Amino acid sequence: MGERATGQRPSAPPSLDLEVRVRLAHARIAHLLDRAGIRGLHLKGYATEPGVYPEHRRSSDVDLLVHPADAAAVIELLRSHGWEPVAAFSEGSIFQHAATLWHDQLGYVDVHRLFPGLGASPEAAFDALWSEHAHLVIAGRPVPVPSPRHQRLVVIVHAARDPFRGGLDVRHIRESLPAESWAALREEAHRLHAGAAWHVATGEAADGVDTRQLTLFAALHESQSGLELFRTRWQSAATVRERAVLVARTIPVNRPHLQMRLGRPVTRADLWREQRARLGALAGWAWTKAVRRDR
């Protein structure tokens, strides 16, 4: 169910049924992390209690949230047990929040070092979710998952970046909860600094919400991309340093993104053509901005 910004494709799909392999992957990963003494929370999909999603929803991968300090160790642990890197953190979304790995029998896992829109910091978000985590038996093994209320909050926060299925998920949660439970969930969203994502996903009042985050999540909800999204991120940046980092991350071509778009392996000519187009678009935007400022 997670976002995947990669064009790499396995040479052959796993022989197992999709649901079976995803459930087995949850159990296997939980076993590996438990044996290594590393905390990890399984998010969304089959790692939720009945009723969180509409009926008959299927999942295509494992979403695993770990403490940022453990992210590198988790990647290495999975690599040592048959998972191969597909996209690094820097090659994923604009938040650089997840790395994707592939296992020939168990399929994809997205390792999250943060959950965009949730928490004052990645560390605070993980600690808040872990502080009241529960266990859900998946493929015969207890798997660490957020509490029932946090399961729903994670789905709603994610919906701010997924306007299609996410909208259905939010509507389902809202309609399936009593009014007082929905109000309590809203309060929890604000307590965990998820007000911007909550507003964008639910359309409810945005009182007291960080306007920069609100602008960014609204752009993602509207499926902005390319130069349009760059403009929004530039306007949302609070400091010169943030804008410098934005430019530095925007200029290099994201190979997995490009491969996904092309549907084939990327060549040097593809990279050069994409790089030239990207630099040209940024130069044109900078020129237009300078001309407007001088008027």
Regions found by a protein language model. Give the residues of each.
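Conserved NTP-donor binding/palm subdomain of two-metal-ion nucleotidyltransferases/polymerases, i.e.
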Residues: 1-60, 66-295
